[in-house]
């Protein structure tokens, strides 16, 4: 088999599928190569005893109507095909060092009110924290992207420390740990994690943390369906084993199926 495509995407995780949707809907010939049996990457779900269990994305923020993630899903053409359910009012519970359970509440007003009720002496610092997190989070709004700029107001916080910012806002060691309690969501490391990452994750979830009823495999399936509708191709069970080049230009991908076959797809762009 030998086919030519405008774009070849290696891997069908969320990023690969999103690229496939955007490029195929613009009329490009897209082929996605995936070594697993089904597309999705960390979006894949599995079933045990009649229950669907997600492997990677358990909940996602900014999925409320008008939220930036919801707008992206609508742009991809899948927003209305997914069963999106908001999490409970207390969308997350953190327990730093086993010192008790502390809820993260939906909405900035409730988030601030709840933490202030637990740490009344830190009211001003909690307010400062919320204001800055919201400011950074709003820097990736849809209107910013429409202007052709990439989060110009927030990128400067990539060089700021999340831990230092939290320490500047509040003095109580326990509250500092509570505010940093979601760091596993972004692989947070005290010495290195930037304020930008911390703010984007917490802002997104405070604004609109939701889950996908039936599992996140539905996201992958819906994106894959859009790609095929736009004429794209998704090859599953196909491992990319080599890139072919001519001079300094990549010209194709070689696919290997054990020792039995090797298929080369020629393309001008590899993602």
What positions do the PLM features span?
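General beta-strand structural signal in soluble alpha/beta enzymes
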Residues: 34, 53, 177-178, 235-236, ...
